A protein has these predicted regions:
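Cytochrome P450 core scaffold surrounding the K-helix E-X-X-R motif
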Residues: 23-27, 54-56
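Conserved "right-hand" nucleotidyltransferase catalytic core of DNA-directed polymerases
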Residues: 1-24, 35, 42, 129, ...
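Active-site-proximal helix-loop-helix substrate-binding element of RNase H-like nuclease domains
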Residues: 35-66, 72-175, 276
Length: 394
């Protein structure tokens, strides 16, 4: 089966799928291929007319050597997951080419279809296919393939491989009829190999050093919160500098609901008094609220500027930036304090905490997502490595 005349693709096509354990603890993805306690329970593949399933480590290693030595085109759905497992069994991505049916669909749909499931893609191509509901529910419940009846698993895996092969044939026909897109599609498949290898290699991370730095940042955060609360204690109803609504009200003013004690009135309209006990003679009260007006910290000129330019008057980072640029006095200092506090918070919760939580043996293995954004931009998760910058020393 010759896919492209430029020699990039080989004639040997192998469609595969792996079923694995689900043993990685939170916050990791349970079936994470880079978590050391997970492994392949079964590997199903189709090569020409041959369909087979492998269960032993030795047979999977032999399979990996075979597809690498003979430079196969490996086909799968959400293929990076399978490749990451196979790399642990010795697969060298330099020796194979790949075709991800999910990635191809994402490209061919104009990036409208994101991370579609195998079932959704089969439906799109009008292929009869339905996953076993019982097995799907067990996977969702955190039960790995090693905890599922092997005969049921065998049927489940065989069905997945067959429909993936059928989808590939449909996509291959489309590919051959879209000459203008062929080079781009091949480049995108290659990019998937690159990011899969990036995930596998990971990034070394000093966990103990990060934990110490996180402690220091957390202490600094507490000190800053107390300092801001003390400095701005005279602002009406401002008690929590981490509350966006309180920050917005302090800056822009407005009506706030304030808890008050309300006298309980009898049927005659007179206050009801306690008839006995320690409070005898005192007026009974109940909890209520009154609306109070808070005056804005920002100047009227700044309010007019925001209104004229259509800017949102809130506590967003953009609003705080504009206030620091165009206002003066207390409003600027207040905005600076809140911005500084948020920066410390972000450093802890965006960098230190997730990086520490996701590190395995001093290495972070992020997931790079190809099929999420409508712009085609790559995204990253578990953890999000794209938030890194050169302004923060980690």
């Amino acid at each position: 089966m010759n896919i492209a005349g430029d020699g990039f693709w080989t004639q040997k096509v192998t469609v595969l799928d792996v079923e694995t354990t689900i043993r990685a603890p939170l916050p990791h993805f349970g079936a994470s291929p880079t978590y050391p306690t997970n492994w392949i329970v079964s590997l199903g593949y189709k090569h020409e007319d041959k369909e087979e399933q492998l269960y032993s480590k030795r047979s999977i290693i032999e399979f990996v050597h075979w597809v690498g030595e003979e430079a196969h085109l490996i086909v799968g759905h959400n293929l990076s997951f399978d490749l990451l497992y196979l790399m642990r069994y010795g697969l060298n991505l330099d020796f194979v080419n790949i075709w991800d049916t999910q990635k191809y669909n994402y490209i061919s749909s104009g990036r409208i279809d994101g991370q579609v499931s195998l079932e959704q893609l089969a439906k799109k191509y009008r292929l009869p296919f339905k996953k076993d509901t019982e097995i799907k529910e067990r996977f969702r419940a955190g039960l790995g393939a090693d905890e599922i009846d092997q005969e049921l698993l065998r049927i489940y895996l065989k069905s997945d491989v067959r429909v993936t092969s059928q989808i590939f044939e449909k996509q291959l026909e489309e590919y051959r009829n879209s000459e203008a897109m062929q080079e781009y599609i091949l480049e995108m498949m290659y990019s998937l190999k690159v990011t899969t290898d990036m995930t596998y290699q990971g990034m070394k991370f000093n966990v103990e050093g990060a934990k110490e730095a996180k402690k220091d940042k957390t202490l600094l955060l507490e000190v800053q919160e107390e300092r801001i609360q003390e400095r701005w204690k005279d602002l009406y109803n401002f008690t929590n500098p981490n509350s966006s609504s309180q920050v917005a009200t302090a800056l822009w003013g407005g009506q706030v609901k304030v808890p008050v004690d309300v006298e309980v009135l009898g049927e005659d309209g007179e206050p009801v008094r306690y008839k006995s006990g320690d409070k005898k003679g005192q007026i009974k009260t109940k909890k209520g609220f009154s609306m109070e007006t808070v005056q804005p910290l920002v100047s009227q000129d700044t309010i007019d500027l925001f209104n004229n330019r259509g800017w949102d008057k809130n506590a967003s980072a953009q609003a705080l930036t504009y206030i620091q640029k165009y206002d003066e006095g207390d409003a600027v200092e207040f905005a600076q304090d809140i911005t500084g506090l948020r920066h410390i918070n972000k450093t802890i919760n965006t960098y230190y905490k997730p990086y520490i939580d996701f590190a395995v043996s001093e290495t972070i293995h992020p997931t790079y997502n190809h099929c999420i954004t409508q712009t085609g931009r790559l995204s990253s998760s578990k953890p999000n490595m794209q938030n890194m910058n050169n302004k923060e020393q980690l």
